[in-house]
A protein has these predicted regions:
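Membrane-embedded transmembrane alpha-helical bundles that form the catalytic cores
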Residues: 1-394
Length: 394
């Protein structure tokens, strides 16, 4: 089920909002002095979130519940076992990465081993929807508890709510636990929240249905197939259409998630900030999928040493992982390394002289490299990718 489905818009969402508003009344009337002032609302949201997820993944909903239960136990262990809290964190991280690796990357790694002459059975495992997002949120929870930036969640249902919340479960943004921990147990919904949230949701829906879907048709018209007859003009039209499609699609889903969250009393962080207006690739990645960027910055880049030591290596690791996170395919790895190289070069060259370069030149420079990056991102077949770039540059 996706937000643009008619069933979601005219059946699921109205029914959920009705039940949620009734549960809000129950919380106010039945639990005015409780320490958990959102118990009924949380239970309602969890039930509908599991239905939402099970609609497309009836079996994998149990995988998500098991994953949450493991993190629930590990989180409590980190907080209670002072002497072994680091060991508990490591166990939790390994469990999360094993689940993600098994379902997302096992087939890819098996194919790589087969390509170098080893005989390895290639598992046929379908990818659970949203597993990359909810795995990273689970990791965020464990690390925030370990760093004492948040307390462990003592109610399993509330942790399940954090991980499975349907507004951001499928396509983000990645919600940091320390930013919503208080709202899980105590949040208030005002008329202003509902109005602003609804407006944001419909803006996102318009981006997806009116703009992204149309640009998708244009991109597919030029970039699908064997590409043997693709002209330079066709290549540019196709990749520019895809550049616009992926922005309106992804930012549209983020707008809908943020808007729905606002209607429910949650304040999710922004995920996009006019990224195509950037004057460098470094700036672009501060404005594109901001929740993923902040995750890698705070949980990978800075712990590795950040700007203090081995900066180039740290950047490479982050961008290699960024590429892997987007998909189990070589083109995504190349795409990540491509941007990692550019960001590294910018730190040592462009960013030191950027104020002397005309803005229009910087914008054109950034857009060109972004478009080339989306070309790498689009094609999983290297033959098609080669034909595309040969056509793109004549």
């Amino acid at each position: 089920m996706v937000f643009s489905d008619l069933f979601f818009l005219f059946v699921f969402l109205p029914l959920f909002m009705l039940c949620y508003m009734l549960s809000n009344v129950c919380d106010k009337q039945l639990r005015p002095n409780s320490t958990n002032k959102t118990a009924v609302r949380n239970a309602t949201l969890v039930v509908f979130s599991l239905i939402f997820y099970a609609w497309g993944e009836p079996m994998y909903v149990f995988l998500m519940i098991i994953s949450v239960f493991i993190n629930y136990l590990v989180g409590i262990g980190i907080e209670r076992q002072e002497k072994h809290r680091k060991f508990a964190l490591i166990i939790g991280l390994i469990c999360n990465l094993l689940i993600l690796g098994t379902f997302k990357y096992a087939g890819f790694f098996a194919e790589v081993l087969c390509s170098v002459g080893l005989t390895v059975p290639i598992p046929k495992i379908s990818l659970p929807i949203g597993i990359s997002f909810y795995t990273f949120q689970s990791i965020s929870y464990l690390i925030d508890v370990y760093r004492r930036q948040a307390s462990s969640q003592r109610r399993f249902v509330d942790l399940l709510l954090y991980v499975s919340m349907f507004p951001q479960l499928i396509a983000g943004p990645i919600v940091r636990y320390d930013l919503v921990a208080k709202e899980i147990n105590d949040r208030h919904i005002t008329r202003h929240d509902v109005v602003e949230g609804s407006y944001r949701f419909f803006i996102g829906l318009g981006k997806k249905v009116i703009l992204a879907n149309q640009f998708s048709e244009i991109a597919n018209q030029f970039l699908q197939g064997e590409l043997s007859g693709l002209t330079m003009q066709g290549a540019w039209v196709g990749i520019i259409a895809f550049t616009l499609q992926i922005f309106f699609d992804f930012s549209g889903y983020s707008d809908m998630a943020i808007g729905l969250g606002r209607c429910l009393g949650f304040h999710f962080a922004e995920n996009f900030d006019h990224p195509y207006c950037s004057r460098s690739i470094t700036e672009f990645w501060r404005k594109w999928h901001m929740s993923l960027g902040s995750f890698f910055r705070d949980y990978v880049y800075i712990p590795l040493g950040g700007n203090r030591r081995h900066q180039a290596l740290n950047i490479f690791v982050v961008w290699f992982l960024t590429g892997m996170w987007h998909g189990a395919s070589w083109n995504f790895i190349i795409w990540g390394v491509y941007f990692g190289i550019i960001v590294t070069l910018e730190k040592y060259t462009l960013l030191k002289v950027i104020r002397y370069i005309p803005r229009v030149v910087l914008h054109l420079y950034s857009l060109l490299l972004i478009i080339i990056g989306w070309g790498i991102f689009y094609f999983t077949d290297f033959t098609h990718m080669q034909r595309f770039f040969l056509s793109l540059f004549g």
